[in-house]
């Protein structure tokens, strides 16, 4: 073994395997491009993005970790969303109030 060596497994890796997916259209109504990262709670994304934030509650983009989707001004774009996993708690963005998404206290 060589330090830092990476051993790859066989076959393809499916991201978000088994996750329920939601598809919606997003339009950037602003005058500058907006990028949204892979683990951002989508309803809290830039206010210039026009989409159904209520339907997107508890979801993030269905893209590989560490990547982002760029929304150009005035361009409609269809994206797939997946539910946030883990404890389903969101802190530090603009959710009011911050905390659990599923109503548990």
From Swiss-Prot:
Pathway recorded for this protein: Nitrogen metabolism; urea degradation; CO(2) and NH(3) from urea (urease route): step 1/1
**In terms of one coarse class, where is the protein primarily found?**
cytoplasm
| Ranges that cross the membrane | none
Q: Which GO terms describe its molecular function?
A: urease activity
UniProt keyword annotation of Magnesium present: no
Short name of any one Pfam family annotated for the protein: Urease_beta
**So what family is this one in?**
Belongs to the urease beta subunit family.
What is this protein identified as?
A: Urease subunit beta
Instruction: Recite the lineage of the species.
Output: Bacteria, Bacillati, Actinomycetota, Actinomycetes, Mycobacteriales
